[in-house]
């Protein structure tokens, strides 16, 4: 049979698939005639694949570890591995494949035609083909498999089968390993033995024959650590102070100052906003479809928590269940914005799926989403367990709490979660289809069995909520806010009474009547607020004191609880009548003022107002205890139909989420500390210890430094999950203080570890989008470092706030930030890094960058008005890049500055020296060392 190379194959298949008719192609006398593609038999397609795969790359030696095993692991072992053995067959080693299962040997070395495995992966019958789900194996994979079998199915003799999932490194609780003691040349020994981190890094250097780069210049370290911890480059004054400090504690003093700075929380708060998928609300018009209005309260909680060094475990507990753990603490309730952000109005299943998927990825470092349709292919997590985990979150909904001084929930409020439906069932969706739930069985809340043990338990206890959590109107500030608004309404009404004399006589009298009625309405409103507040408090007292009935006096002359409820209800009816009377007066005035052609309409409105007033007056004397409690919170609509909109807030909560939060943050849990440490390490060191940052499972990549990861995780937990402690450890390590340059490094370093996964040098890191913009403002002296507050519209080009405060949502992106790889709102566990021409153009030509360059130049000049060009050049380098210019740079840039000045004069431009200096600043802003953290 003639050989067909890969290029011919690809060309053939493109034509075969893309065209409506099958290409006339002759191979050894076999002709695929020009039949319509829709009529091509599956057998014909399969035969074509078989003919091609049998000849493709036939003479090439097949490498089992590189070409065969990855395919078996990816496509086969989910059903034929350690977790599951369909038909008694395992394919995780060549020996087990040759041994076979119930149908016999899957592979017969040397005889591909008789090998069951090859027959099944090339089968054209859908019921026979393997794998049964997803796309068939690719042609080159089939060819490699066929040729490997023909070549006697050679594999390493020491190949080991998959270990049981319980033995997977990430599923075992970390224990503190002994720090390696490494013999290092005396000149380096002192530096590499002061920090435990360095012992682990140095051990890998020795194992792989790597030589660490020397410690970087103090200026470079100062810029590196300042940008890492606060996102802002050091000022020339800060840099000079550090250079002058020759004490052993100089580095530590800098770290302490940076960690104590409020800008630390803004910098690292943005990192966690990436991981936890922060997104402002988006929708259509005023309709919220995803996330929540005022979700910025959660963002501010993140920044505040990071600045105060709140334990990471405590942060997780508050985000998942502050409403159950701290139901009366509005400050902590902000944290549940994490769950409120998952809101999706159109589909509750999508809402909960994203809650599960991203909680697992961010907090556990595991991927659970595929288990909604079938058992997990790699980790011991079944479809049933997926829906049991969903049951943990099933009852929660969202409401917005009133904040002091604001009655309008559209203007402000704290979005938080609560368990709205305590008995809502969870059913398994057959093959993940929400339209096909299995209602024969209710899923009870549970956590994955493979992460549970006698020590690590998931125990649910129902939570009895305090009355203020059930009736937010009882909060003192809520009553105060309502009263203040009513009192302002009264003052406004009194002022209106005094201004009616300016109208014509007839209208003036009617206007006075309207103003007086409005005053009565305002006074009735205040009276109603007081009456309802009294009744609310009485009912609260009744619920707090067992044995007190509704008609039991609380004092010898005190009104009964029933009396207060009746009074509150009557006050509401009086308020309704007062408003109706005011409306009637306004209708009378409108009739007098109406034009001739509008008289009939005005008369109709007056008649309607008279009817409403009569109804309201009649209702005043009705006997009823039903009144509207003072509103202290507003429920978010649950779905597009807004069902259950008026349901009262429950008096208890299921306790499911607080049980989950406690289980998750148990110090013995194997995953959360490791996952957090990996994220923090990556953002300092430029690459993670576990490359698959959201997948620590069996399909993820193992850690490059497993002992270091475990040591850091244990250290993290034993120091109260303190992020500041971890930061200090990392940034004061010798590994962190290395040069990022490979200049002078042995050739073996780059040949053995080209990607620097063993940290023989520091990794240079490109600034994130927010840090680029913030530093332009910072260098210009224009940055507003104010903490917190509502999100800034993306089109507000006048704002100089830090970039994390811009609106960030599916619909709205700040254009400058988007240019520099801003965070993806759908998920962003690790920022992308791109280098594209548009970035340089943005720094060179955008109005924002141009304006900041001018202000940077002006600021430097103002600090030293009589500075020479050489002095200006040196100060500019130190200000923007934190380094002194080299002799070569000094000469080159001085010449450039001179030429730009002369060119500006030739073109008769105003202020040529200033223009040239501004251009010099812009040049340095486009320097790679500005946008790179070295």
What are these regions (language model features)?
Residues 920:
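Globin-like tetrapyrrole-binding proteins
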């Amino acid at each position: 049979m003639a050989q067909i190379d890969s290029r011919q194959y690809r060309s053939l298949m493109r034509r075969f698939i893309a065209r409506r008719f099958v290409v006339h192609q002759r191979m050894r006398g076999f002709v695929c005639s020009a039949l319509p593609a829709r009529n091509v038999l599956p057998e014909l397609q399969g035969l074509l694949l078989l003919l091609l795969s049998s000849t493709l790359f036939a003479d090439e030696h097949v490498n089992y570890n590189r070409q065969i095993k990855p395919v078996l692991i990816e496509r086969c072992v989910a059903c034929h591995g350690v977790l599951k053995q369909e038909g008694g067959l395992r394919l995780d080693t060549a020996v087990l494949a040759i041994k076979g299962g119930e149908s016999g040997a899957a592979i017969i070395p040397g005889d591909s035609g008789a090998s069951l495995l090859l027959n099944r992966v090339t089968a054209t019958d859908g019921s026979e083909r393997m794998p049964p789900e997803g796309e068939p194996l690719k042609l080159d994979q089939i060819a490699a498999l066929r040729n490997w079998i023909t070549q006697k199915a050679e594999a390493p003799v020491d190949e080991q089968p998959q270990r049981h999932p319980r033995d997977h490194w990430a599923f075992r609780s970390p224990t503190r390993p002994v720090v390696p003691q490494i013999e290092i040349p005396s000149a380096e020994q002192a530096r590499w033995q002061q920090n435990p981190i360095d012992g682990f890094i140095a051990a890998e250097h020795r194992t792989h024959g790597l030589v660490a780069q020397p410690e970087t210049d103090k200026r470079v370290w100062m810029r590196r650590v300042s940008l890492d911890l606060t996102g802002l480059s050091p000022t020339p004054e800060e840099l000079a102070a550090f250079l002058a400090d020759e004490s052993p504690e100089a580095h530590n003093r800098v770290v302490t100052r940076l960690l104590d700075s409020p800008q630390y929380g803004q910098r690292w708060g943005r990192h966690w906003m990436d991981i936890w998928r922060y997104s402002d609300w988006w929708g259509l018009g005023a309709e919220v479809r995803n996330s929540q209005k005022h979700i910025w309260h959660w963002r501010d909680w993140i920044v505040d928590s990071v600045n105060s060094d709140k334990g990471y475990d405590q942060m997780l507990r508050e985000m998942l269940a502050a409403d159950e753990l701290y139901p009366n603490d509005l400050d902590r309730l902000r944290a549940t914005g994490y769950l409120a952000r998952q809101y999706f109005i159109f589909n509750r299943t999508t809402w909960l799926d994203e809650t599960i998927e991203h909680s697992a990825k961010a907090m556990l470092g595991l991927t659970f989403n595929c288990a909604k349709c079938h058992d997990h292919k790699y980790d011991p997590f079944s479809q049933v367990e997926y829906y049991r985990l969903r049951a943990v979150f099933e009852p929660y909904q969202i409401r917005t709490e009133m904040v002091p001084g604001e009655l309008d929930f559209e203007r402000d409020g704290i979005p938080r979660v609560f368990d709205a439906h305590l008995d809502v069932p969870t059913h398994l969706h057959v093959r993940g289809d929400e339209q096909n739930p299995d209602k024969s069985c209710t899923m009870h809340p549970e956590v994955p069995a493979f992460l549970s043990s006698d020590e690590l338990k998931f125990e649910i206890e129902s939570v009895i909520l305090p009355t203020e959590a059930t009736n937010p109107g009882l909060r003192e500030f809520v009553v105060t806010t309502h009263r203040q608004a009513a009192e302002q309404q009264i003052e406004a009404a009194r002022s209106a009474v005094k201004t009616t004399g300016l109208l014509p006589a007839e209208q003036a009298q009617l206007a006075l009547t309207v103003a007086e009625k409005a005053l009565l309405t305002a006074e009735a409103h205040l009276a109603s607020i007081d009456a309802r507040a009294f009744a609310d408090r009485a009912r609260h007292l009744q619920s707090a004191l067992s044995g007190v009935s509704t008609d039991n006096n609380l004092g010898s002359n005190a009104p009964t609880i029933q009396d207060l409820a009746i009074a509150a209800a009557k006050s509401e009816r009086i308020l309704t009548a007062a408003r109706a009377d005011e409306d009637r007066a306004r209708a009378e005035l409108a009739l007098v003022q109406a034009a001739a052609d509008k008289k009939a309409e005005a008369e109709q409105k007056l008649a309607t107002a008279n009817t409403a007033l009569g109804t309201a007056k009649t209702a005043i004397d009705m006997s009823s205890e039903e009144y509207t409690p003072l509103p202290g919170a507003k429920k978010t609509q649950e779905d597009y139909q807004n069902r259950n909109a008026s349901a009262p807030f429950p008096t208890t909560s299921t306790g499911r989420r607080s049980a989950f939060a406690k289980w998750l943050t148990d110090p013995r849990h194997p995953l959360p500390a490791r996952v957090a440490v990996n994220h923090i390490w990556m953002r300092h060191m430029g690459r993670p210890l576990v490359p698959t940052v959201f997948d620590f499972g069996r399909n993820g990549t193992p850690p490059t430094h497993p002992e270091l990861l475990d040591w850091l995780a244990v250290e993290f937990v034993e120091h109260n999950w303190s992020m500041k402690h971890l930061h200090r450890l990392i940034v004061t390590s010798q590994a962190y203080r290395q040069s990022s340059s490979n200049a002078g490094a042995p050739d073996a370093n780059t040949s053995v570890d080209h990607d620097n996964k063993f940290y023989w040098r520091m990794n240079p890191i490109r600034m994130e989008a927010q840090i680029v913009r913030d530093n332009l403002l910072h260098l210009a002296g224009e940055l507003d470092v104010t903490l917190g507050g509502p999100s800034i519209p993306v089109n507000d080009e006048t704002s100089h706030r830090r970039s994390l405060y811009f609106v960030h949502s599916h619909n709205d992106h700040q254009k400058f930030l988007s240019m520099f790889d801003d965070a993806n709102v759908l998920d962003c566990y690790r920022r992308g890094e791109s280098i594209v021409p548009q970035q340089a153009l943005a720094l060179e030509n955008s109005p924002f960058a141009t304006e900041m360059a001018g202000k940077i130049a002006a600021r430097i000049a103002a600090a030293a008005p009589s500075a020479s060009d050489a002095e200006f050049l040196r100060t500019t380098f130190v200000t923007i890049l934190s380094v002194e210019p080299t002799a070569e740079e000094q000469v080159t840039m001085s010449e450039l500055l001179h030429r730009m000045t002369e060119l500006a004069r030739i073109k008769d431009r105003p202020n040529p020296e200033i223009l040239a200096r501004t251009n010099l600043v812009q040049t340095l802003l486009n320097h790679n060392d500005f946008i790179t953290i070295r």
